[in-house]
A protein has these predicted regions:
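Conserved P-loop NTPase mechanochemical-coupling segment
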Residues: 116-146
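Phosphate-binding P-loop
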Residues: 31-42, 159-161, 189
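ATP-binding Walker
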Residues: 52-53
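Loop/turn-to-beta-strand initiation segments
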Residues: 103, 162-165, 191-198
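ABC ATPase nucleotide-binding domain signature region
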Residues: 44-46, 56-124
């Protein structure tokens, strides 16, 4: 995929980091595979894999290593409800280009409610109080006053901008199939404007983004795969081609 160049070209072990030893998350094959480094696409990089394969652990570690809040938001978000992120980020080295992002954001589906609540807490509470409304950058409307999917799209349409670095953890969790298409279109606009995405997803729709790099997290570590070979695509196609057969196998006593 051709762009003006990636903000982060690759991710490697930091000096002295030991991968593949110890407990969680080092015991995950996908994490251990980082010992060999991971190249990122200058446009869109996807991580796919079963629940528990480590893709969300990787996304979180990449975002934290880039200076973002572990629970979501930008580098300026200072809230914390539970210190649950792993120590993996401290063991990573981001190989950056000379380009620097104009903006950045870490979108976590599981903690987006907390992110929205933090934004609400930053709003002026008294008439005439100094400081602008932080929600202006998110469409001017409370994210809590919208559906989960609407608030996700409000974030992408309003807060995300050109020359941005964005980490998304399962954004499809809040989106209908139709809005997954909207998400792909918005990503395309932002990549054309110099942005870079790293996305963990189960969505065959998002994975169809043209020219994206897809890594599958599995028992053998991290493997680069084509769209047609990605597990979410294969399983979805198989089910849609023969739903009765799949259901018969699943529901047999």
């Amino acid at each position: 995929m051709e762009t003006d160049g990636a903000f982060i070209k690759s991710i490697e072990p930091a000096d002295g980091a030991a991968f593949g030893s110890g407990g969680y998350p080092w015991s995950l094959p996908a994490v251990a595979a980082l010992a060999d480094g991971l190249e990122l696409d200058p446009g869109v990089t996807f991580l796919v894999g079963e629940n528990g394969s480590g893709k969300s652990t990787l996304i979180e570690a990449f975002a934290v290593a880039a200076g973002l809040n572990p629970e979501g938001g930008s580098r300026n978000f200072q809230f914390s409800t539970r210190d649950s992120h792993s120590a993996l980020s401290a063991s990573l080295k981001l190989n950056r280009s000379l380009r620097r992002p104009r903006t950045d954001f870490f979108l976590r589906a599981e903690s987006f409610f907390t992110t929205a609540t933090y934004l609400e807490s930053l709003r002026p509470t008294e008439p005439g109080e100094r400081g602008g409304d932080p929600l202006a950058a998110y469409g001017g409307r409370s994210l809590h006053e919208q559906s989960h999917g609407q608030s996700f799209l409000a974030l992408m349409m309003n807060r995300f901008g050109a020359d941005g670095l964005y980490f998304l953890d399962e954004p499809e969790a809040a989106l209908s199939a139709q809005n997954c298409f909207t998400c792909v279109r918005r990503m395309h606009q932002l990549v054309a404007d110099g942005s870079q995405f790293v996305v963990a997803t189960h969505s065959p729709i998002l994975l169809a983004y043209p020219g994206a790099t897809i890594y599958e997290c599995g028992e053998d570590g991290l493997a680069r795969v084509d769209y047609d070979d990605a597990e979410p695509v294969r399983l979805t196609r198989g089910f849609l081609a023969a739903p009765e057969r799949y259901l018969r196998m699943l529901l047999e006593d």
